[in-house]
């Protein structure tokens, strides 16, 4: 009875044995698309929690699940090999604001090279007016992070 109890107590530790955390330091560049004077570069440290089924990067969750409601669409992907991790998040929503049909789109793409300990992460945030047959970009924000992880 005691060996079974000990195995049951140790089982959670065995199932999380592939999980680990990284701290990545690098250069983050932010700017408004089409406005070169808005470019801002800072040194930043981000945390990453890696799991077999997904990862949390700077507060954002990446896995292979999708979520579709009447209000929004969220599609995520996460692929982990022994050498690399690639992940993506695509979020979109539509809203009627002051009689205009506004679409908000957020796209994140992450590449982590485990062997070289480096990361490249891009984030795009777009707000588009879809009221007329022509799309008008209201706001287009870009952010990229390139760094080294430990």
Language-model-detected regions and their locations in the chain:
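Edge beta-strand at a domain terminus
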Residues: 123-150
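Beta-strand elements of well-folded, non-transmembrane domains
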Residues: 26-32, 118, 127, 149
């Amino acid at each position: 009875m005691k060996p079974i109890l000990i195995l049951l107590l140790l089982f959670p530790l065995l199932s999380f044995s592939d999980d680990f955390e990284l701290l990545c330091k690098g250069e983050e560049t932010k700017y408004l698309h089409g406005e070169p004077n808005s470019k801002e570069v800072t040194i930043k440290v981000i945390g990453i929690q890696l799991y077999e089924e997904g990862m949390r990067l700077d507060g954002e969750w990446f896995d292979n699940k999708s979520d579709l409601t009447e209000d929004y669409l969220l599609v995520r992907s996460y692929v982990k090999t022994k050498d690399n991790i690639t992940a993506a998040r695509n979020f979109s929503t539509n809203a009627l604001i002051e009689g205009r049909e506004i679409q908000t789109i957020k796209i994140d793409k992450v590449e982590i090279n485990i062997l070289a300990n480096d990361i490249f992460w891009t984030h795009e945030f777009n707000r588009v007016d879809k009221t007329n047959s022509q799309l008008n970009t209201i706001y287009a924000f870009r952010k990229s992070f390139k760094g080294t992880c430990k």
